[in-house]
Amino acid sequence: MAEAPPRRLGLGPPPGDAPRAELVALTAVQSEQGEAGGGGSPRRLGLLGSPLPPGAPLPGPGSGSGSACGQRSSAAHKRYRRLQNWVYNVLERPRGWAFVYHVFIFLLVFSCLVLSVLSTIQEHQELANECLLILEFVMIVVFGLEYIVRVWSAGCCCRYRGWQGRFRFARKPFCVIDFIVFVASVAVIAAGTQGNIFATSALRSMRFLQILRMVRMDRRGGTWKLLGSVVYAHSKELITAWYIGFLVLIFASFLVYLAEKDANSDFSSYADSLWWGTITLTTIGYGDKTPHTWLGRVLAAGFALLGISFFALPAGILGSGFALKVQEQHRQKHFEKRRMPAANLIQAAWRLYSTDMSRAYLTATWYYYDSILPSFRELALLFEHVQRARNGGLRPLEVRRAPVPDGAPSRYPPVATCHRPGSTSFCPGESSRMGIKDRIRMGSSQRRTGPSKQHLAPPTMPTSPSSEQVGEATSPTKVQKSWSFNDRTRFRASLRLKPRTSAEDAPSEEVAEEKSYQCELTVDDIMPAVKTVIRSIRILKFLVAKRKFKETLRPYDVKDVIEQYSAGHLDMLGRIKSLQTRVDQIVGRGPGDRKAREKGDKGPSDAEVVDEISMMGRVVKVEKQVQSIEHKLDLLLGFYSRCLRSGTSASLGAVQVPLFDPDITSDYHSPVDHEDISVSAQTLSISRSVSTNMD
């Protein structure tokens, strides 16, 4: 029977009808027994889960003709590239112990420079020339080998591979300087060894080309880049200072030339005056030219005081620019350290967001964990190992067959017996060797039969489209490769052992034979637990990433701490000012009132306080209204009590309603005035008298 295609162990939601891009997850691996007894070769899958063609070569040693030679050549090529990359990093990007070699080269170059200087002194000329000749030989050998190795190691970069790439690398400025110094050294050595005095004297000046060797010490040009960036960043300030200083120099030199040209021969030309102005304004002061007239001295003093300030400005601008640039580089390095924690925090936050149960449409994180979780086959083997550990290293079948003395309590819990191969129940020893699909099928059939002992007859089991016949499923040599987590309404697997029971409560062998190997944990029970565990893992990883990111936000120097405290202090002052404004608005004291209090003026009267829109004015107004209402209620209650005591209608008309104090009710005006109350009282007395006469 044709083998069904492997199914995906999906942790995410089941795929819908619409096609979507998915990662192929794990499939249940075949057991060693299945590989030994199976007739056909297992299906081989690629990295993305697609089946490989039958004729594809097998990976590993001996997978084809010439594979050993190919592997040796590949390993040699890897070692070659690794060595080339290592040499390039040592020469071009030194770190750690690689600086030892560059320090050695610097000492050689500096020694050669010192000997070149000593060779110009008559007393040390002979000794310096002999030492310099030996050192030049060493320098030629070292620099020649280094130049060749540099050109060779540049092949690790893509742009410098091949002959054209090597030529492009040789045209770099520092490589050109190395080549010029090497040729000059060879020429000097050749002229010195031939003994040609004329050639030696002519090429002696070429020794000072070795000064260029000091330039090559900074191979990456970091100092020049730093200087260029500082000059470019402060170009406007430098141009302004240089322009004003140049104007001061021209005017000072011209005026001093006009004042000194007749009386002083040192200022016979404008060029001599410019030389004097340059030496004076730059605060060098050689003293070779000085003004003699008082007019020239006054002009020189005035322009010196004015011009020196502008000539000294570029030094301060460059110094502050260098300091700011270095601080910016340190800050940039500190910010670069935050890049990885920030990326990890964003990734952890997104994965935590995507693992929320309410967002079932986000499946990428579930597929990721689906690909790294162990297969159900490994999980079944793990449960078998746990069971054997509980049974003292024996399989469940061996535990059942072990002889037990009569009357002695059983040491191990009884297990189910093995049935015939055609039945749907299996002994635990064989069920541990089965694939997860067979175990799921077995558990589902046992739940269907129930306690009515229907397991003795082979029942008809509903099978999935990818399932096989029962006879084939019972064979341990035919193991399914995978099973889907998403078939939740289908077959359930037994994945956990029952707890141990005591000897008294243990069922007999007949009952054990009737009861099959059932379990309490199913795929439906596993999936929520697995997702909950993954969700908790994502929460922990998010909290860890958040803590690490907060650690990188800490200030790294004292200046940052001061800036942080100053910013916090300003924020606190702003909050206090806002709070004070709100308190003044509630109390009813505005900015003008506060200024008046500070000056010692008298505060506003009570009437002004009542008329204010502030909270205090509103409270005073409400209190006045409440007092007015209480006074009116007292008057009405007194009037009513007097009417009840008199008991006659005549007394009701005779009683005069007291008038209300207008001062008390200044803030509240009743809809009924006192005149209306008196009129209503008279009307009430007339109506009562009429009613008594009618009676």
Swiss-Prot record:
Positions of region (C-terminal assembly domain (tetramerization)): 546-650
A GO BP entry: sensory perception of sound
Binding site for a 1,2-diacyl-sn-glycero-3-phospho-(1D-myo-inositol-4,5-bisphosphate) 2: 220, 235, 330, 333
Disordered: annotated span: 1-21, 400-480, 496-515, 587-606
A Pfam family: Ion_trans
Coiled-coil positions: 615-636
Consequence of changing residue 125 to G: No effect on inhibition by potassium channel toxin SsTX
Membrane topology: Multi-pass membrane protein
Outcome of swapping residue 93 to A: Shifted activation curve of KCNQ4 toward positive potentials compared to wild-type. No difference in current density
TM regions (residue ranges): 97-118, 130-152, 169-191, 203-223, 236-258, 294-322
Topological domain ranges for the Extracellular compartment: 119-129, 192-202, 259-270, 293
Biased composition (Basic and acidic residues): 591-605
Compartments where located: Basal cell membrane
Organ and tissue specificity: Expressed in the outer, but not the inner, sensory hair cells of the cochlea. Slightly expressed in heart, brain and skeletal muscle.
Record's function text: Pore-forming subunit of the voltage-gated potassium (Kv) channel involved in the regulation of sensory cells excitability in the cochlea. KCNQ4/Kv7.4 channel is composed of 4 pore-forming subunits assembled as tetramers. Promotes the outflow of potassium ions in the repolarization phase of action potential which plays a role in regulating membrane potential of excitable cells. The channel conducts a slowly activating and deactivating current. Current often shows some inward rectification at positive potentials.
Official protein name in the record: Potassium voltage-gated channel subfamily KQT member 4
Native source organism of the sequence: Homo sapiens
Lineage: Eukaryota, Metazoa, Chordata, Craniata, Vertebrata
